[in-house]
Amino acid sequence: MTMEISHILEDLVYDNGVLPREAIEAAIVKHHQITPYLLKILEEAIDHVSDIIDDDCYQGHLYAMYLLAQFRETRALPLIIKLFSFEQDIPHAIAGDVLTEDLSRILASVCDDVALIQELIETPHVNPYVQAAAISSLVALVGVHKLSRETAIRYFGELLNYRLEKKPSFAWDSLVASICALYPKELFYPISKAFSAGLIDTSFISMEDVETIIHEESIDSCLKEVLSSTDLINDTLEEMEKWLERFPFES
């Protein structure tokens, strides 16, 4: 029996303590019909973010993001960016570990305009973990041939030199790690300046790590790894099952 759109949304929006497997599968089957409703969920989440924070059972925005990412729905990009542009700890409050684990892949999955992601990275007061996810999403775009390495490295150089606020944060750690993923030799000097300025957490990545990659890897070897390891959001049910393995529902 085919689930109605209203029933699918009802099962997805609130956490009832079980994985809404049937609703996810039905949403995927009704991809085109349900997409406008999923976009509407994101629009409403932006307008009612405080309600989401106060309601531990609400999860509609999360399922909407994963499904729209699987659908490669580019209309979701500006909505997701707006949702994660709230300051301080709001992004973590509404998304939990999705912020650090999957936001970069979600952004890359719905991206048709790199400029929007760049704007998110450069916007003052954006949560540094959001900035980090946005930076990492550019590496993912290289990994799926939607952005050239040359373009990404050029932009990362601009972030190092003047586009990213020179304030220690996880965004800087992610920036250096992302550059290293694409091979860092061209940006060795501005990277070393960032370390000298104390912008990088050396327990996350050190200058020695950067030098080792330069000496032991190459553009080709780094690109090969990025191309083989990049994984966008392809199966929402599989993604949710992974989360369930890590964080089982409490009985």
From Swiss-Prot:
Question: Which Pfam families has this protein been placed in?
Answer: DUF1186
Q: Which family does it belong to?
A: Belongs to the chlamydial CPn_0206/CT_203/TC_0475 family.
Name it: Uncharacterized protein CT_203
